[in-house]
Regions:
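Iron-sulfur cluster-binding cysteine motifs and their immediate structural context
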Residues: 2-4, 9, 15-37, 47-64
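Glycine-centered flexibility motif
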Residues: 12, 32-34, 84-85, 99
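Conserved SAM-binding loop
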Residues: 12, 45, 153-154
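Short, charged amphipathic alpha-helical surface segments
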Residues: 41-42
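Iron-sulfur-associated redox domains of electron-transfer enzymes in respiratory
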Residues: 54, 60-183
Length: 183
């Protein structure tokens, strides 16, 4: 079995699926691990999947602009959130200032990512999600908005942020928030 990265080392960011134009990659998901399996019949050996995989190509180490901790001042936001509501406050502020936000939400029994510029829709992003999530086509959706000159905030796990940075060619209007990973 040929895989994008070393067997049982796949973080499940799914960027390789978004990048592959030949639909040659399937994610094999078992209880503990993901594996990005390459269909060698469909694969044309372009190497794009490996170029964006954060386990194969490390993202350039950049010092954070700043490092903060805190909580929402709004008691309603704080009480609805799992960890003080800081992510919700950042998300709502970003949208109110004309940006789009991509983050994980529960939709029809599945944890998926969505891109929105609606604070009402962004309410679905609230809460900790200590589960595997499926970014599906979020990297493509974000890249389209960035190409349109829109500002986009991505809130996700470090592996997903790294995958997005490897995937995106237009990072001038890309903002990211890495959440602590418990996986």
């Amino acid at each position: 079995m040929k895989t994008v990265c070393a067997k049982d080392m796949c973080a499940g960011c799914m960027a390789c699926i978004n990048m592959c134009k030949k639909s040659a990659i399937t994610i094999v998901d078992d209880y503990k691990t993901y594996n990005a399996v390459i269909d060698e019949v469909k694969c044309v050996n372009c190497g794009l999947c490996e170029k964006i995989c954060p386990n194969v190509k490390c993202v350039e180490q950049v010092n954070p602009i700043f490092w903060k901790e805190g909580w929402a001042l709004n008691p309603e936001i704080r009480s609805n959130a799992s960890s003080g509501g800081i992510a919700s406050s950042i998300i709502y502020s970003f949208i109110k200032n004309g940006g789009y936000v991509a983050s994980c939400m529960l939709n029809k029994g599945e944890f998926v990512f969505e891109l929105t510029n609606s604070t009402q829709r962004a309410e679905q992003f609230v809460g900790s999600k200590y589960v595997k999530s499926n970014p599906k086509t979020i990297y493509i959706d974000i890249e389209r908005k960035l190409q349109e000159g829109k500002k986009v905030l991505f809130v996700g796990l470090p592996c997903q942020v790294a995958a997005l940075k490897n995937f995106s060619r237009n990072q001038d209007n890309l903002y990211t928030v890495d959440l602590i990973c418990h996986g």
